[in-house]
């Protein structure tokens, strides 16, 4: 039986996540499978992979053929590196302890690279948020200044409108007083 390691789609439209399964190559994409060995969520940044490493390695050693995406996932997780090192042990190039040490060194190097990438992304997010906040502060200052100018103009206009009105009310009173004085 030709076995494949491939992805089985789950999730909703435009938000897919996948199960990594061992299936007969003739089975439909989301159909019957032999074993589920992990999950893959490409929606996160970086993509989240939860993999049963030992089961994946066992199936690769048995000769199961991965799909292109699964091959990239297995390579990134170190399954193919482990297979390569086990091949060296089988040929007698080095011992199993040395192979394990090389694998751990490779894994630590890979994880430190991922941690650096994550830290860089966090810094970029913080810088972007800070820049957005500064831009918003500038916009708010401009709006506040324009509003203050508008209120000052309205107050001046209101004061100017009240001054002639007061003069107008005082002027008829003075005229009335003048006419009363003239009448006496």
Curated annotation (Swiss-Prot):
GO terms for cellular component: cytoplasm; small ribosomal subunit. Residues 174-184 have a biased composition (Low complexity). Keywords: Ribonucleoprotein, Ribosomal protein. GO terms for molecular function: structural constituent of ribosome. InterPro entries: Ribosomal_bS16, Ribosomal_bS16_dom_sf. Residues 150-160 have a biased composition (Basic and acidic residues). Residues 164-173 have a biased composition (Acidic residues). It holds the Pfam family Ribosomal_S16. Residues 150-184 are annotated as: Disordered. GO terms for biological process: translation. Belongs to the bacterial ribosomal protein bS16 family. This is Small ribosomal subunit protein bS16. It comes from Bacteroides thetaiotaomicron (strain ATCC 29148 / DSM 2079 / JCM 5827 / CCUG 10774 / NCTC 10582 / VPI-5482 / E50). The lineage of its organism: Bacteria, Pseudomonadati, Bacteroidota, Bacteroidia, Bacteroidales.
């Amino acid at each position: 039986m030709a076995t494949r390691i491939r992805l089985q789609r789950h999730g909703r439209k435009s938000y897919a996540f996948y199960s990594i399964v061992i299936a007969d190559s003739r089975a439909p994409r989301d159909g019957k499978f032999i074993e589920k060995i992990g999950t893959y969520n490409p929606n996160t940044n970086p993509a989240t992979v939860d993999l049963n490493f030992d089961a994946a390695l066992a199936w690769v050693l048995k000769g199961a053929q991965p799909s292109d995406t699964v091959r990239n996932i297995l390579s990134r997780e170190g399954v193919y590196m482990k297979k390569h090192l086990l091949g060296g042990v089988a040929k007698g190039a080095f011992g199993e302890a040395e192979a394990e040490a090389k694998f751990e060194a490779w894994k630590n190097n890979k994880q430190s690279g991922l941690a650096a990438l994550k830290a860089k992304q966090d810094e970029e997010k913080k810088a972007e948020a800070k820049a957005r906040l500064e831009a918003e502060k500038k916009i708010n200052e401009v709006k506040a200044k324009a509003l203050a100018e508008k209120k000052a103009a309205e107050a001046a206009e209101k004061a100017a409108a009240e001054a002639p009105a007061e003069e107008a009310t005082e002027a008829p009173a003075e005229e009335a007083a003048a006419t009363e004085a003239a009448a006496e």
